[in-house]
């Protein structure tokens, strides 16, 4: 099992959800986050000093079986891409265990 974290532009959420649903991946956690690009864009403040301009983003967290990893990554990349700076990032981690609290199912059965 793998955990995927994807940082995407908010207006791309529905498209990414649809792309993942076509693979049978429907459960995920979505969190509103803010970030700033590698090339920091400064915005004026009341003190006159520039401050990094944080951009609104969404962080998607989902767990997939190993056999769906490549397809899930491809769907996120295809659906979230705008070909502009700051389209986002995808992080993949090995997942040791998943436990569904209600049923106590473990592993892939708990996804």
Where are these regions (language model features)?
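Positively charged, small/polar-rich N-terminal and surface patches that mediate targeting and assembly
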Residues: 1-111
